[in-house]
């Protein structure tokens, strides 16, 4: 028991119940002005949700806050989505049972680690098509891709050559720090033609192990985002129809997709941050050298 200033004792349970009752009395009905302010926000949330059905409240809040410039709290977005049944529920049956034996590589600068993989997509009137992507693990930008009706070594090399021409127009051998390409142990990346091409391009290969589910996690996560945003909500009859929408999606992903791991920056914003940082360092070096010569 606790004794108050009058000498009366009060047990802890009674004190706890009184506190709960006081909190309940303090809760008031939301004002009409506040409710009116929620209307345009809810309209915008529903519009974003219609375009991206599997986006959660954090990503929707980040898009509204950092891409559209709306000053809004994360809890407010969570409340509005919860009141209108717009939240994404977790499927506990899909929880992974494997555990990684070692951590995945962490990229600290662009072009340090690239990830490459393939996924297949079924078209209703055509059959299977194969999507190959190359991802920069630092900026999360898709820098190379190729869509085909097969998944041969040449298809993989086409996507890889696009990535090289995007980031190294003058060739990798003329740049410092050659990228490391992370792939699985499939027949395409382990073929002699692919290994020889990587050696000629100046790319070092890293192969994931069978007992390391996080070995190429960043690249596989991009395919999940692709299927959530584009594949599962649309249907195509012919490959070229998918190709057009896929290229539009890649442009939107690189320029307009906020990433939590990038402090809600887009991939191209993250790349521009490193470019500005390098330019600032070079300017400082030039100033120091000019002062020494003077």
Descriptions of predicted regions:
Residues 1, 5, 45, 60, ...:
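Mobile genetic element proteins and their domesticated derivatives, centered on retroelements
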Residues 2-113, 266-278:
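Basic, flexible linker segments flanking DNA-binding modules
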Residues 31-32, 199-203, 225-294:
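C-terminal domain-tail junction helix/linker
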Residues 37, 41, 53-57, 73, ...:
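Hydrophobic (often cysteine-bearing) scaffold residues that line and stabilize catalytic clefts
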Residues 39-50, 70-135, 141, 154-162, ...:
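Mobile-element integrase/transposase regions
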Residues 63, 80-84, 163, 193, ...:
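Alpha-helical structural signal in soluble globular domains
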Residues 91-95, 178-185, 199-218, 234-239:
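RNase H-like polynucleotidyl transferase catalytic core
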Residues 145-146:
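Short hydrophobic alpha-helix segments
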